[in-house]
């Protein structure tokens, strides 16, 4: 059984990211994979290492600040989780959390401008294009890892 954690489901859900979890449920059901999804947020007792997959969506700046403060108590667990090759999917500004907490090796820099628009990506994982939308005011710098996607249209 796959144990999934939708972390900060209530306040990091700016663009209806709960639909990403529903899409994941649909795909797992279609493949007849057994899973359990827990929904946790601020003030919940969270045992990061109990999960096989963690998802964090996009939030407003106010929500981001609350989550950043809350995640500090899980920093070492998140580092171990990643070192153990477990999976975390973040969308939008949730990626910036891992820079601000210095969990991953990149720098997220806030800019005076916003990047808004649709993007088209390719990846070696699937044959089809991946289409997404960005509305952000941060730029990723000093990133030394191999990106998951290659941007074919838009800014990324």
Regions found by a protein language model. Give the residues of each.
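N-terminal beta1-alpha1 cap of cysteine-dependent amidohydrolase-like domains
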Residues: 1-76, 80
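A structural micro-motif
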Residues: 2, 35, 86, 128-130
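Fold-independent oxyanion-binding glycine-rich loops
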Residues: 7-9, 40-42, 58-59, 91-94, ...
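Generic secondary-structure signature for well-ordered alpha-helical cores
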Residues: 29-33, 106, 140
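Short, well-ordered coil/turn elements that cap or connect secondary structure elements
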Residues: 32-34, 83, 127, 143
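Short loop/helix-cap segments at secondary-structure boundaries that form the rim of catalytic
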Residues: 46-50, 99, 143-145
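Cysteine-nucleophile active-site neighborhood
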Residues: 60-127
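Amide-donor transfer/coupling interface in amidating biosynthetic enzymes
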Residues: 108-156
């Amino acid at each position: 059984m796959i144990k999934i954690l939708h972390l900060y489901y209530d306040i990091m859900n700016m663009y209806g990211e709960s639909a990403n979890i529903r899409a994941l449920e649909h795909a797992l059901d279609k493949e007849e994979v057994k899973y359990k999804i827990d929904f946790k947020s601020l003030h919940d007792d969270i045992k990061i290492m109990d999960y096989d997959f963690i998802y964090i969506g996009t939030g407003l700046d106010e929500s981001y600040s609350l989550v950043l403060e809350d995640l500090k108590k899980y920093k070492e667990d998140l580092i171990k989780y990643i070192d153990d090759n477990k999976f975390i999917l973040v969308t939008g500004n949730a990626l910036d959390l891992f820079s601000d907490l210095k969990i991953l090796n990149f720098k997220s820099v806030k800019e005076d401008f916003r990047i808004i628009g649709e993007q088209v990506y390719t990846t070696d994982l699937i044959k089809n294009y991946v289409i997404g939308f960005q509305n952000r005011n941060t730029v990723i710098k000093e990133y030394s890892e191999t990106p998951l996607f290659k941007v074919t249209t838009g800014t990324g």
